[in-house]
């Protein structure tokens, strides 16, 4: 529910902005400009929407997930950078990328990072922090310089050393299951 009016929602009548009629939403937050942004499953995919006077408007509609399983506590898959820009994790088949999204145009530029999992994403000034991991990289708390797109691993989840060439990189695939539905596996 939200109220039209100011950012603090103190003015105007309350109305449902998203999340009714079987729709699930999460990570509702206001942009720096005061626009409420949510991740919604209304399209069948977890996509980003902004709630405006004319209703929920898709920001970057794609057949990809910008959300994640709701049984994970503290889930944070996107964060506002400045102005009309945000960082967001997105992907399909369990492999995510981190991208810089222009909220006005919907243009999404993926950052070239060595991770395929991004959790706990936060932004402060010109630095983003997240827990990143990949098929041959253990989980790590990572600081990303938003000016240079360079990462620094602040703390590794494991200090075990191994030769990455001894690991098999999992490949995501889809197959048809019951009633013509698509299932995902590794």
Language-model segments: which ranges?
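Peripheral, non-catalytic segments that deliver or gate enzyme domains
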Residues: 1-186
């Amino acid at each position: 529910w939200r109220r039209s009016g100011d950012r603090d929602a103190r003015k105007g009548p309350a109305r449902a902005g998203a999340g009714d009629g079987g729709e699930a939403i999460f990570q509702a937050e206001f942009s720096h400009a005061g626009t409420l942004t949510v991740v919604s499953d209304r399209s069948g995919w977890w996509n980003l929407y902004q709630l405006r006077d004319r209703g929920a408007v898709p920001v970057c509609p794609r057949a990809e997930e910008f959300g994640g399983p709701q049984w994970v506590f503290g889930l944070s898959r996107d964060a506002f950078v400045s102005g009309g820009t945000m960082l967001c994790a997105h992907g399909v088949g369990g492999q995510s990328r981190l991208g810089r999204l222009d909220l006005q145009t919907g243009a999404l530029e993926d950052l070239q990072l060595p991770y395929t999992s991004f959790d706990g994403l936060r932004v402060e000034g010109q630095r983003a922090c997240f827990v990143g991991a990949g098929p041959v990289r253990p989980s790590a708390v990572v600081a990303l310089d938003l000016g240079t797109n360079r990462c620094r691993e602040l703390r590794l989840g494991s200090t075990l050393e191994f030769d990455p060439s001894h690991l098999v990189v999992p490949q995501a695939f889809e197959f048809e299951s019951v009633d013509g539905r698509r299932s995902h596996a590794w």
